[in-house]
Amino acid sequence: MAMKKIEELKDNFVGPRTLLYAKAIADLSKATLDITPDLELPVEVDSLKATMEDPTFNHYKVIGLAGDWATTSELGDFSVEFVVPSKAKDLLIAMFGADAVGDLTKLTLKTGDTDLDATTGFTGTALELKKFKIQGTIIIVDETKTNLMVITNIALYATMQWDETGTKPVAFKFSGSVEGAGKKSIAWLSKAAA
């Protein structure tokens, strides 16, 4: 078998265009599958990360030898994180569960400021901040819409972030890992030729 040249090994995934979320966990061991996304998430530029930590090495030494007699390792943790700058009700339900989200049909302020004390009041959504595991599959679509990165068996948690109040909107940081030990959980795909 001939050595593979650099040009033959070029197979990049770069430039995410959008991130889709599906509640269903995809079985990446199958040759064909269908995924129906539930949400197209508005992700803050440069907040998307999918990384794996360095492995932990275990060195076994014996008397009289300077080097390792044997070496073993444990895989590093895989983590996924991204920031979604939206408080849309459908997103809140996906992040915290339907029972944590409620409608406020009218809130009336009595401040003496006629702009704030509108007789029509304010309407909106109430949220109970609680621990809720977001499970399923994310699909990252590249800028050309011809390549995908699929990460399934995800377990994510959302936390509210609003620390740059003058320049950034209220946002939620999704962070977590893959719970797919022993399962194929990441795939890179390219659009098939017609």
Please report, for each region that a protein language model flagged, where it lies by residue.
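Mixed-charge, glycine-accented linear interaction segment located at domain edges/termini
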Residues: 145-194
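Charged, amphipathic alpha-helical segments
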Residues: 2-7, 85-126
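Short acidic (Asp/Glu) patches
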Residues: 55-68
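A generic structural signal for short beta-strands and their flanking turns/coil linkers
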Residues: 46, 56, 74-80, 132-136
